[in-house]
Amino acid sequence: MLLVIDVGNTNTVLGVFNGNTLIQDWRIRTIRESTVDEFNLLAKALFVDKKIDLSTIKRTVISSVVPPINSILDTFCTRYLNQKPLWIDPASVKNLMPICYSNPAEVGADRIVNAVAAFERYKTSMIIIDFGTATTFDAISAKGEYLGGAITPGVMISAEALFQRASKLPRVEIFRRPQNVIGKNTIDSIKSGIIYGNGALVDGMVKRMSKEMGTTPKVIATGGLAVLIADASETIEIVDNALTLEGLRIIADQPVFSEGQR
């Protein structure tokens, strides 16, 4: 079986594939101060809970935007899984997708993985929006080229800044959009601004990016808050929260990688 790991600034997502089927996934906090042994204990507990034997993991592929975690995961794989993981970066996927960036090495591994997965699934021009610690917009051409994108502060980062800097505003939990855009109390007004405001941000960015692309791209959202913001957006067509994990599987199954890891 294949273990895929996507390390983000806030959360780390792990998934186990049996062939092309994702049989289990977990979302845990990214803890930069964690040790190899601590990560091993956590991983073992997760696997035992789902009755998955670590010894059945024959290959591991990782994307990470948190360098301090990389050595921990690398050692975990070699010490406890008896294998070297495949690390994803722009150079490792250059044969799968041309990256039209002035410096391809600057593109986050997660963004490239999303792009590879989305193009493999939909085979058309598209804009991928990933709602993570940052909200990223990535444009893919109909030829499967990574054209570039945009980065904005994430939904929760923006909300946290508001709560910290505006002392009279209460901290609110954001689980569902309010019924009305015009809030009738402070809490609903904050929820409206955060949720509908981010929905409008998405729609505005999609409109501008589509104009530059000269196409009508398919708009795909992923990430922890994708469902919530998609409900407030007029342009998001598909929510695919397994996109990054699926992209890691697709890359790992390319002959140049899979043969080297067997």
From Swiss-Prot:
Catalytic activities: (R)-pantothenate + ATP = (R)-4'-phosphopantothenate + ADP + H(+)
Any Pfam family the entry gives: Pan_kinase
Binding residues for ATP: 6-13, 133
Domain of life the protein comes from: Bacteria
A biological-process GO annotation: coenzyme A biosynthetic process
Pathway: Cofactor biosynthesis; coenzyme A biosynthesis; CoA from (R)-pantothenate: step 1/5
Cellular location(s): Cytoplasm
GO MF annotation: an example: ATP binding
Record: residues binding substrate: 101, 108-111, 186
Active site positions, chain numbering: 110
Cofactors that this protein relies on: NH4(+); K(+)
Annotated HAMAP family: Pantothen_kinase_3
Subunit text: Homodimer.
Protein known as: Type III pantothenate kinase
Source organism (scientific name): Desulforapulum autotrophicum (strain ATCC 43914 / DSM 3382 / VKM B-1955 / HRM2) (Desulfobacterium autotrophicum)
Source taxonomy: Bacteria, Pseudomonadati, Thermodesulfobacteriota, Desulfobacteria, Desulfobacterales
